[in-house]
Structure formats: C-alpha cells, structure tokens
Curated annotation (Swiss-Prot):
The keyword Ribonucleoprotein applies. This is Small ribosomal subunit protein bS16. It comes from Pseudoalteromonas translucida (strain TAC 125). HAMAP family: Ribosomal_bS16 (MF_00385). It holds the Pfam family Ribosomal_S16. Belongs to the bacterial ribosomal protein bS16 family. Keywords: Ribonucleoprotein, Ribosomal protein. One of its GO terms (cellular component) is small ribosomal subunit.
Length: 82
C-alpha cells in the first residue's frame, strides 16, 4: 500500500523531515517513490516551516495513497495557509 509519510533527516536533536510518497513495506528512511515537500519543526524567524506540493499530494491521494496521521495534519494546515 502506498502512503505519504515523513522521512527523518537532520542531526541528533535537530530533526528535519522530508514528506515522501513510499510503499508502506519500505523502511522509514529507506526507498521512496516521490518527494512532495519538507517539514522543519524547529524553524525560527523567517525560515520556512513547511513546503508542500499540494497538487502532487492530491494526485497521490486520488491514486489511493493514504496519509499518515502527522502528514494529514500538515496537509490540513498547508491548505488553510494557502
């Protein structure tokens, strides 16, 4: 099953997440199909906290992809901000 979820990057104690479309059988930080954005939970000042390619997310959801709980909340927030 294809899912849209977070892929962790960054340094210890300083997380940075890529938002990726991946098969649910692949490991969290492993192979993915497409990168559709990023999420920086510790952004400060004028730094961009989230960037999301909403048309691609809509495309994948239309193809049957499911959203992880956290990504669903991020998509909702991104739609509200747009």
């Amino acid at each position: 099953m294809v899912t849209i979820r977070l892929q962790r990057g960054g340094a210890k104690k300083r997380p940075f997440y890529q938002i990726v479309v991946a098969d649910s059988r692949f490991s969290r930080d492993g192979r993915f199909i497409e990168k559709v954005g990023f999420f920086n939970p510790i952004a400060a000042g004028q730094e961009e906290k989230i960037r999301l390619d909403l048309p691609r997310v809509e495309h994948w959801v239309g193809q049957g992809a499911s959203l992880s709980d956290r990504v669903a909340k991020l998509v909702k927030d991104a739609r509200k901000a747009a």
